[in-house]
UniProtKB/Swiss-Prot annotation:
GO terms for molecular function: ATP binding; glutaminyl-tRNA synthase (glutamine-hydrolyzing) activity. Keywords: ATP-binding, Ligase, Mitochondrion, Nucleotide-binding, Protein biosynthesis. Belongs to the GatC family. Allows the formation of correctly charged Gln-tRNA(Gln) through the transamidation of misacylated Glu-tRNA(Gln) in the mitochondria. The reaction takes place in the presence of glutamine and ATP through an activated gamma-phospho-Glu-tRNA(Gln). GO terms for biological process: glutaminyl-tRNAGln biosynthesis via transamidation; mitochondrial translation; regulation of translational fidelity. Its main location: mitochondrion. This is Glutamyl-tRNA(Gln) amidotransferase subunit C, mitochondrial. It comes from Trichoplax adhaerens. Subunit of the heterotrimeric GatCAB amidotransferase (AdT) complex, composed of A, B and C subunits. Its EC number is 6.3.5.-. Pfam families: GatC.
Length: 149
């Protein structure tokens, strides 16, 4: 079934074959909302500051331009905050976001299990019973991070 263009939206265009006979995509001529307008309407949103970007820089071992990173991350956070506006009270949770095919749950039958010591035996370094990955020099020098013997 073809979707006809709406008068209040921009021009519609057809997708290339084989979709051109049944699908239209409508693109508004102008953005329908702005992050800045959303921020003004939602004063209780969370922001990141420079100390957060310093911490992220240490975790990733990658130098970042703090001002630019703050702008981008705060924009992403505020965009994600829009999800709070969606009313999901009467919506059943999904087991998967893939709805093109059925996804079956595990039957609950126990299979072969491996104990924690056997799993951690493969770790190069262990921190509080977890595998660790290389991180910043500040974290590597921490007395809590002990190399496996």
């Amino acid at each position: 079934m073809a979707v006809k263009p709406s008068a209040n939206l921009g021009k519609a265009f057809q997708l290339p074959h084989p979709f051109n006979s049944c699908v239209y995509i409508q693109i508004p001529p102008q953005p329908t909302w702005s992050i800045n307008e959303y921020w003004e309407r939602n004063p209780n949103k969370q922001y990141l500051d420079e100390s957060d970007t310093t911490y992220l820089e240490e975790l990733t071992l990658t130098p970042i331009e703090k001002h630019q990173a703050l702008e981008k991350l705060n924009t992403i956070i505020s965009a994600a905050d829009r999800l709070q506006e969606v009313d999901t009270k009467n919506v059943d949770p999904m087991y998967t976001c893939v709805d093109e095919r059925e996804m079956y749950m595990n039957s609950g039958q126990d299979g072969e299990t491996v104990n924690k010591e056997e799993i951690l035996g493969n770790a190069h370094k262990i921190f509080q019973d977890y595998f660790t990955a290389p991180t910043s020099e500040k974290m590597r020098s921490s007395s809590d991070l002990n190399a496996k013997e």
